[in-house]
Amino acid sequence: MTTSTGTTTGTGTARAAEGSLLRSDWTEAEARALYDLPFPELMFRAQSVHRRHFDPTTVETATLLSIKTGGCAEDCGYCSQSAHHETGLKATKLMGVEEVLSQAQKAKDGGATRFCMGAAWRSPKDRDLDAVCAMISGVKAMGLEACVTLGMLTPDQVTRLGAAGLDYYNHNIDTSPAFYPEIVTTRTMDDRLDTLASVRAGGIRLCTGGIVGMGESVDDRIAMLLVLATLDPHPESVPINMWNEIEGTPVMGKADKPDPIAFVRLIALARLLMPQSIVRLSAGRDAMSDEMQALCFLAGANSIFTGDVLLTTANPERDKDAALFARLGIRAAAPAATEMRSAAE
């Protein structure tokens, strides 16, 4: 098929780019062909697909709180919270339920519609899960969506989280299968996928994405998205993180961050591969210009974290985000992700 710009694409790639179907059988060649499109064509296709499924003037706002910081047994090379690295981060115990709910109320007052809680564990202990479930129930009672990231889960733990009312479980795949052993050695990609399968089987929505700028190749970045886009069904939420440089981590000094245009291409590809997923412009926004973020929204990103801290790294202040939204004519989404669907969907 030849587009109006003279670009030739495969039939399956063109159909998906037109937003006519959801696919979980993407190939590497198809994804690469989309990524390599002339930038104006790529942006046009991504925005066109985005408009078929979402209100293009609406962006979800979420707040992320570290409820248990540091001391993690995993050796993720990008993470300040690993006990294997000397990053100067002091480990803390699990926060109390009331303290967490107080922070959730502040997040709601600041305009957040989803409250995400992260604990630096390889996997949670059952005794700690009691407190986390109480946090989830309290967050839900405020009218916020609840999301947690706790590490690997057993099916029984998934059931307990679901009973507490959990909306989303975050469990990032980090990077491509090929590059994964370069970043993490204490777990495998299959371990991550097994937990995602358990969460899906338990009826909880998936929030799973990855990190770029850790020294991986463009092919690795595309392969990471392909892992997500070949899940059936697709994850409901896909966070894309730009790695924040953290002294003391093994990745420090090896990072090779994509330039702004390359990063925007990745956002556009995520939108084309997973048309109905929320695509979150996640960590790393603090170093992005307003213009770069605007291009990401145009490419199909429709979620951000608000608040000046993401777990242990910086994030733009709420006032700065509000000013950017005002300049772009963007408004915050309603609490439920389904409210973001366009009237035509």
Swiss-Prot record:
From the UniProt record, give one GO term of the biological process aspect: biotin biosynthetic process
> Which InterPro entries does the UniProt record give?
Aldolase_TIM (IPR013785), BATS_dom (IPR010722), Biotin_synth/BioAB (IPR002684), Biotin_synthase (IPR024177), Elp3/MiaA/NifB-like_rSAM (IPR006638), rSAM (IPR007197)
Per the UniProt entry, the Enzyme Commission number(s) are 2.8.1.6
Necessary cofactors: [4Fe-4S] cluster; [2Fe-2S] cluster
Instruction: State whether keyword Transferase applies.
Output: yes
Catalytic activity of the protein: (4R,5S)-dethiobiotin + (sulfur carrier)-SH + 2 reduced [2Fe-2S]-[ferredoxin] + 2 S-adenosyl-L-methionine = (sulfur carrier)-H + biotin + 2 5'-deoxyadenosine + 2 L-methionine + 2 oxidized [2Fe-2S]-[ferredoxin]
Entries under Gene3D superfamilies matching the protein: Aldolase class I (3.20.20.70)
Per UniProt, [2Fe-2S] cluster binds at 116, 147, 207, 280
Q: Tell me the SUPFAM superfamilies matching this sequence.
A: Radical SAM enzymes
Question: Which residues bind [4Fe-4S] cluster per the record?
Answer: 72, 76, 79
Q: Which GO terms describe its molecular function?
A: 2 iron, 2 sulfur cluster binding; 4 iron, 4 sulfur cluster binding; biotin synthase activity; iron ion binding
| CDD domains, alphabetized | Radical_SAM
Q: How cofactor binds (record note)?
A: Binds 1 [4Fe-4S] cluster. The cluster is coordinated with 3 cysteines and an exchangeable S-adenosyl-L-methionine. Binds 1 [2Fe-2S] cluster. The cluster is coordinated with 3 cysteines and 1 arginine.
One Pfam family per UniProt: BATS
Supply the enzyme class, top level: transferase
- Where is each Radical SAM core domain found? 57-285
Sorted alphabetically, the keyword list is: 2Fe-2S, 4Fe-4S, Biotin biosynthesis, Iron, Iron-sulfur, Metal-binding, S-adenosyl-L-methionine, Transferase
The organism sits in which domain of life? Answer: Bacteria
> What pathway does the UniProt record associate with this protein?
Cofactor biosynthesis; biotin biosynthesis; biotin from 7,8-diaminononanoate: step 2/2
Per UniProt, subunit arrangement is:
Homodimer.
Family membership noted in the UniProt record: Belongs to the radical SAM superfamily. Biotin synthase family.
Free-text function comment from the UniProt entry: Catalyzes the conversion of dethiobiotin (DTB) to biotin by the insertion of a sulfur atom into dethiobiotin via a radical-based mechanism.
- Cite the HAMAP family for this sequence: BioB
UniProt cross-references to NCBIfam families, sorted A to Z? bioB
Mind telling me what this protein is named? Biotin synthase
This protein's species is Xanthobacter autotrophicus (strain ATCC BAA-1158 / Py2)
Q: Which gene encodes it?
A: bioB
